[in-house]
Amino acid sequence: MKIHTTEALMKAEISRRSLMKTSALGSLALASSAFTLPFSQMVRAAEAPVEEKAVWSSCTVNCGSRCLLRLHVKDDTVYWVESDTTGDDVYGNHQVRACLRGRSIRRRMNHPDRLKYPMKRVGKRGEGKFERISWDEALDTISDNLRRILKDYGNEAVHVLYGTGVDGGNITNSNVPYRLMNSCGGFLSRYGSYSTAQISAAMSYMFGANDGNSPDDIANTKLVVMFGNNPAETRMSGGGVTYYVEQARERSNARMIVIDPRYNDTAAGREDEWLPIRPGTDGALACAIAWVLITENMVDQPFLDKYCVGYDEKTLPANAPRNAHYKAYILGEGPDGIAKTPEWAAKITSIPAEKIIQLAREIGSAKPAYICQGWGPQRHSNGEQTSRAIAMLSVLTGNVGINGGNSGVREGSWDLGVEWFPMLENPVKTQISVFTWTDAIDHGKEMTATRDGVRGKEKLDVPIKFLWCYASNTLINQHGDINHTHEVLQDDSKCEMIVGIDHFMTASAKYCDILLPDQMPTEQEDLISHESAGNMGYVILAQPATSAKFERKPIYWMLSEVAKRLGPDVYQTFTEGRSQHEWIKYLHAKTKERNPEMPDYEEMKTTGIFKKKCPEEHYVAFRAFREDPQANPLKTPSGKIEIYSERLAKIADTWELKKDEIIHPLPAYTPGFDGWDDPLRKTYPLQLTGFHYKARTHSSYGNIDVLQQACPQEVWINPIDAQARGIRHGDTVRVFNNNGEMLIAAKVTPRILPGVTAIGQGAWLKADMFGDRVDHGGSINILTSHRPSPLAKGNPSHSNLVQIEKV
């Protein structure tokens, strides 16, 4: 390819081969003044200048990070995405750079499949048959049905479905329908979350809260032990945790041990040791480590005596049975008579006894040790017990409330105190678990406090009749047992109205009766708070990048219009006379009151972000309690760490539980259902666990082509299990159990334990739900259960048994 003029250069078709051949020309061009950049003579005088601008915004999906985005706009379209370019990017004041998901956000904004107009369902729920309607018809239909259901059934018949598609927003948050319902008498609310149901419940009984040291405190530790914790995929960006783990370990040179069924991306050469473990057996490992710590006199006895209840006989509550304390349980002197030795745990976990002993000695001798757990181990049928058992290792070694230690839960972060859009008080005090909403639709009047975890009263009076589904794929895709959920939603005499508000025709959107097109947070103004941000808090003032397209509207406008139709009092209570812009200015002003050094509103529109470091350098959970337990008691009945919980002992005695549902007053190991030793393994021999895939945040970004190509949806299977089934890497396989089946590509890899398989959660369901119901999209919930865990009544979505066959 010969090029002699600048015009020819501008018009030439360049391939990689031709570029390599002409590399000498390229070097000459850069060295010569004959070719100057830009080629300004190519601009035609008749062309009008194109208006360009750049605004600050944020990615607000539910990864736990809230990354700064610089959106470059031309012709009212985002064409280029930068991230944080502010400041000097030094440790402690680093740039909040987005991951590849956030950097691909223009592909979401400009996606051809975005919802454009209000629609109403004209086919069966799940068929995806809709017709376009006007905004007035949509809002009138919603308001009329809501008014009717409130009159006929009462406020407990209305529920706001769990959703996290815009979880990081403030006035664009998934929970904004709360405020509308609280403006007109309240609604049946929920407790817990799909992320942390089991661990949040368990830690409330143990510590009175679920809180951990910030990850930057790893700079002060000697050892990092991660149970099922994978921030390199779940919180990989500058607004997340991976940066802190890397930087802090460079300063402490701490040894890092990763315990996970998969060799995950957080390990990936960073770890000093990977211990693969059977899913759901982390509690057995923790108990065996405790056995070594106790028998080798490596526990912090003064800490246990001063700060804890129930470690041994002298701190056991007076009403507890003799030998009901933790030490007796571990040594085999309790009711079960089983010593929790490394040999005992090796048969359960698949980790050799000598490795367990080595790990225990490392934990016992490292002063301090940063022991943490992700949210994967607790997302099992025995998750409440597992999370307590792991946290006990921090308690036994006295690592709670100190620098370089941790409480044994997932890492925490410091909060600078962003003012949140107030949701108002809910007059309805009845609650259900976040995971039991399908039961509340199907047989709500039968749900009780002692069997189903109903709170606020002994039983539900009415089933759910009206469902708000905002930025939520939980309606079908993200909820356990898709086939069961499909059946429940088919009968529209049960839940009479489902209102969906979304950006795309997701699997869940197909089940809505009225479907409204939402503007994305990047198309609106909002005040965005950090979340998993270590010891550096920050707040982002997001500005709309583009004008509204088609008939998309902001959530605040939609709900204001519904409130207006419900009456002037409801409208006034919901809006307080403020527009969305006025609310943002109000929230900014309240945040600035707590942080006087924060720029004023107009200046922050230019700067985009305000960063502030924790005044104590590192955030330490329960520091005040450790320093003075009398003045700063925990929020437990005793004010101390409750190793033995009298409240849990009472619940275990009074709740209706099945034989394989165990609630224990101690952090004891319990197998759970659908686990490694379930008799069902004779039919379905492989354990299946989910994981948070870097290509998506749950199901958000699940329809972005470049991310799908970079990270294909596959089932992980060990070469030993694959060979036994004649499966090769890339083969299409059938994964199935009693709940459902899917066809998916096999990823044959030694990065997963034999006997265990894994599928990244959040892939969009692609199944003919009125035909064979075989999923071709890789949605793990076609295989999971809708049976809740014993205590939290949470989602046990990692406890699954399957078989895999080559197609």
Please give the residue ranges for each predicted region:
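Extended redox/cofactor-interaction regions of prokaryotic respiratory oxidoreductases
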Residues: 2-3, 174-259, 266, 284, ...
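N-terminal export/assembly segments and adjacent metallocofactor-ligating motifs
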Residues: 2-298, 324, 343, 465, ...
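Long, well-ordered, tryptophan-enriched scaffold segments
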Residues: 262-366
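Short beta-alpha connecting loops at secondary-structure transitions
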Residues: 271-277, 537-548
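A glycine-rich phosphate-binding loop feature that marks nucleotide/adenosyl-phosphate handling sites
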Residues: 306-309, 363, 406-417, 575-590, ...
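Active-site phosphate/pyrophosphate-binding segments
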Residues: 322-441
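Phosphate/diphosphate-binding loops
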Residues: 496-497, 544-563
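Long, contiguous, secondary-structure-rich segments that constitute the structural scaffold
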Residues: 555-607, 699-701, 705-716, 720-807
